[in-house]
Amino acid sequence: MCDNKPMAPYAKLPELEEYKEWFKDFADLYREDGILQVTWKTNDGPMHHSGMSHRAISQLVRVLSLDFKNEIIIFTHIGDNWMIESDPNGWETYSELPTQRFQHQYFDDTNLIKNMVFDLDVPTIGAVPGPGFHWDSAFLSDVTICTEDTVMEVPHAQGGLVPGDAMGLMCQHYFGTKRGNYYMMTTRQFTAQDMLDHGMVSEVVPKGKAVERAWEIARMWKLMSYENRTIMSN
């Protein structure tokens, strides 16, 4: 006798309470009415740039894309700045040649950009609370809000690295090739007004208001149909 049931159930999707624990050292996750706020950090303080944070960002973004309860995502950073420090002991495995370094640079670093662009099929907002660097996740979002004191830079050249990751590509895209190259090759900072004038950010708001404004926009999107806002973000 046939009971008309499928032979196997759907594969389990990740649940918020599960991956909150997985990524607790790198992000605070809060969800309300389908709007997820991702607050980057390291332990209980500002996120420190490291191989570990690189991997956490790319992996978390991929996991978020698998949880259909995340209908809108806001990316922000703990405190009044974006990432402003580097972990002095956070890059040791990058020197382990050849396999470890390749895995870091190809799977972790490249996927940090790729996952933001291709994995997230829902509207995203970057809410930048102040100055910093490594601003990829905020500026790869559909809408980016920053505070009026925000200044950013592409610091690689100063650290002995050739610039050209997502920050470099976005500089060339928004500022133009020549001016983008100038910012990359001199590590000169660009201001909130520079970014607004060139379409790199959507709005500039007073200090302390970036996250609040991001939630206002997210709640406005929630008034649209799920299908409309989801397809619109792609």
Language model features: what each stretch is:
Residues 69, 77-109:
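Glycine- (often His-adjacent) and acidic-residue-rich active-site loop
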Residues 109-159:
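Glycine-rich beta-to-alpha active-site loop
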Residues 137, 142-145, 182, 186-188, ...:
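Well-ordered beta-strand positions
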Residues 145-150, 201-234:
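C-terminal long alpha-helix characteristic of the crotonase
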Residues 168-178:
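Hydrophobic, secondary-structure "cap" segments at the distal end of domains
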